[in-house]
Amino acid sequence: MSKKLVSLFLALLMICSMANVTAENNTITVTDMFGREITIEGPVTRVIAMEPSDCEILYALGCGDALVGRGKYCDYPAAVLEVPAVQAGQELNLEEILALNSQVVIMADMAQTKEQVTLLEQNGVKVIVTDGNNIEEVYENIRLLGKIMGKEAEAEAVITDMQKTFADVAAKSEKTEKTIYFEVMPLEWGLWSAGANTFMHELAEICGMKNAFADIEGWQQVSQEQVIERNPDYIVLVTGMGETAVDEVMGRAGWENITAIKNGAVYNADSYAMTRPAPRLAEAVVNLYNFLNGVTE
């Protein structure tokens, strides 16, 4: 074989090798919060995010432009309202999703998620399932979406910012035996609160407080009698019931001897920042600290 042919052969081998490396580099494999290993052909530039928290994470990573669809309840930041909305939760609409031709659909772990994942994947849609009960799982979600979007460094930066805020608040918070009752669902719908292994429980601890329902696990329904018996020092409302929420709680029959009611220590929190497993939990803990310590901005 002549030197010229050898050189040509080696050049072809190099080109093929580079092509294989490029193909491998464009393949993204992740394990979602269901423990499922998912392989996606990258780069990922077309995404549907069904949950508000996942939309917020994507924007925090600088990936808002990749959103071609959003769940109808996704509303932050304001720019996301320009993205086409699709039905979410139990009302998921397969045709709407298929029409948007996304590379991946990101959805949260809910009661109907397994059936919906099966339906979507049977129709050729890649699905990533997220979950975020506690702060560590929020970090996992951020890293997961960061890997999918090729924004791993940005994901770590977002997490570092959150950790710094939590550490700063914890450092200036005195430990106390005082308790917080988080009202997640209002009385008219049946009271629900946050227990152990939730990010709300952890926000209370960061602020030096105890969770009045630390003995329950996750998010559970509670009774008026339980709230009255536990006599919380503070009540934090994350019900999204608007400006009248505090007045409604202050006027509840039988609650008048609760310490929080007697002291007027009822806080109508930004329910979106405090209920979504997303970067704005850092904002939520600052606001919670300010309420607990009487700090005005």
PLM features: what roles do these ranges have?
Residues 33-35, 84-95, 216-225:
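Short helix-initiation/N-cap motifs at beta->coil->alpha
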Residues 51, 109-110, 184, 216-219, ...:
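Short secondary-structure boundary segments
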Residues 4-5, 10, 17-55, 152-182, ...:
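Bacterial Sec-exported substrate-binding components of ABC uptake systems
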Residues 111-122, 229, 234-252:
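A ligand-binding cleft/hinge motif common to bilobed small-molecule-binding domains
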Residues 113-115, 130-144, 177-199, 243-244:
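Extracytoplasmic ligand-binding site segments that recognize negatively charged/polar headgroups
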Residues 45-100, 104-110, 209:
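A short, structured surface patch at a secondary-structure boundary
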Residues 73-76, 192-219:
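Alpha-helical, coiled-coil/dimerization segments enriched in small aliphatic residues
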